[in-house]
């Protein structure tokens, strides 16, 4: 970046010129940054819309809600479990993936308004807190928090939840009623694995983990 030593300019006219040029540079830099940010926001929204409109695949899954049941109009713990199951499936896969909440299976943007009514603070902060608590309850491994990045982009006027899940360095199990369940993202669905099947899969998927233990 260009820097100017003010001590080199002692005359008033040079100081005025310097200040004017500095202000002009600042104004133009500010305009450039705003334009870049606006372009980035437009790019991000366009890219996310492409993800939303694409069919579900090995790296993309959509969920209408986190805990709001559209049929009963009330909270449904099994919906919360399905979120943890999807996260577990991506974490256990080779590539990880993206989970979108507030978008139905057909790609229609629903938003999070109904979920917000059921969580603390009734906003994205409360939503993320309850989501992370729920995930920890079902997956019981704090490493999951390191694997997920949660954001709340606005698309077509609706706020949704985007969860980017990195592949886990070790096997992740889901716990319910004292039992372990195993899921892996395969194709466009999250598949259950019997324990013996998951053991065989884990030997390939987590070979490095087992070689160190």
Residue ranges and their predicted role:
Residues 1-213:
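Conserved N-terminal catalytic/coupling substructures associated with nucleotide/phosphate chemistry
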């Amino acid at each position: 970046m260009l820097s100017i030593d003010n001590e080199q300019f002692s005359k008033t006219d040079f100081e005025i010129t310097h200040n004017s040029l500095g202000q002009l540079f600042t104004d133009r830099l500010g305009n450039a940054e705003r334009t870049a940010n606006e372009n980035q926001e437009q790019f991000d929204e366009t890219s996310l819309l492409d993800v939303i409109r694409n069919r579900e695949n090995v790296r993309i899954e959509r969920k209408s809600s986190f805990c709001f049941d559209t049929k009963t109009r009330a909270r449904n713990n099994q919906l919360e479990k399905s979120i943890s199951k999807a996260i577990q499936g991506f974490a256990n896969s080779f590539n990880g993936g993206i989970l979108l909440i507030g978008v139905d299976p057909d790609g229609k943007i629903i938003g999070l308004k109904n979920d917000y009514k059921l969580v603390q603070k009734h906003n994205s902060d409360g939503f993320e807190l309850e989501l992370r608590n729920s995930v920890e309850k079902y997956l019981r491994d704090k490493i999951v928090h390191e694997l997920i990045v949660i954001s709340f982009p606005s698309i077509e006027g609706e706020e949704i939840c985007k969860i980017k899940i990195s592949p886990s360095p070790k096997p992740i199990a889901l716990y319910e009623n004292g039992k372990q369940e195993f899921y892996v993202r395969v194709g466009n669905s999250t598949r259950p694995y019997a324990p013996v099947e998951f053991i065989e899969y884990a030997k390939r998927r987590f070979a490095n983990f087992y070689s160190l233990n």
